[in-house]
A protein has these predicted regions:
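Alpha-helical and coiled-coil interaction segments, frequently adjacent to or embedded
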Residues: 1, 5-6, 51-58, 67, ...
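A short coil-to-beta-strand element that immediately follows conserved catalytic motifs
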Residues: 41-53
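Conserved Nudix-box catalytic region and its N-terminal flanking loop in Nudix hydrolases
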Residues: 2-41
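Glycine-rich loops and low-complexity Gly/Arg-rich segments
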Residues: 31-32, 40-43, 71-76, 99-101, ...
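Active-site-adjacent beta-strand/loop module that shapes the phosphate/pyrophosphate-binding cleft
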Residues: 53-86
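Nudix hydrolase/Nudix homology domain
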Residues: 10-22, 66, 80-126
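A generic structural micro-environment signature
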Residues: 23-28, 46, 56, 60, ...
Length: 126
């Protein structure tokens, strides 16, 4: 993909990739959340596991170092609602943006708090 969906996360004051805590039935869990959040039928969403990364990172929420297990999935939408064709859009009060990796790398706040994840996505999706 040449652009990725990110959203404004007020707690971090940063644009982040969509993210969810790992769940027992992780792929269904992710599809259900994306379906609900983006107002797309779950049968129009497919998901593919790409990679995993375990590392230590500073938690903005907890103000301490924590160990994270990041699992990367690529999501494909069979239908693409008109609202999502804009560079930015809002659904249920959440502001979303389509951004390229290079745009993320130029964003100082993303570099400060999430460069490791941008690099992880870049390594596995290019």
């Amino acid at each position: 993909p040449n652009r990725f969906l990110v959203y404004d996360e007020p707690k971090w004051n940063c644009k982040l990739f969509l993210n969810y805590k790992t769940n027992q039935n992780n792929e269904k869990f992710i599809i259900d959340h994306i379906s609900h959040e983006l107002k797309i039928k779950s049968e129009d969403i497919s998901i593919e596991y790409m990679s995993q990364k375990i590392h230590e990172k500073y938690s903005q929420n907890h103000k301490e170092m924590r160990v994270y297990c990041h699992r990367l999935y690529q999501v494909t939408l069979k239908t693409f609602p008109n609202i999502m064709q804009d560079n930015s859009f809002e659904i249920d009060g959440v502001q979303y943006y389509w951004m390229s990796i290079s745009e993320m790398e130029r964003d100082s706040r993303i570099r400060e708090v999430n460069q490791d994840i941008v690099d992880f996505v870049k390594e596995n999706c290019s």
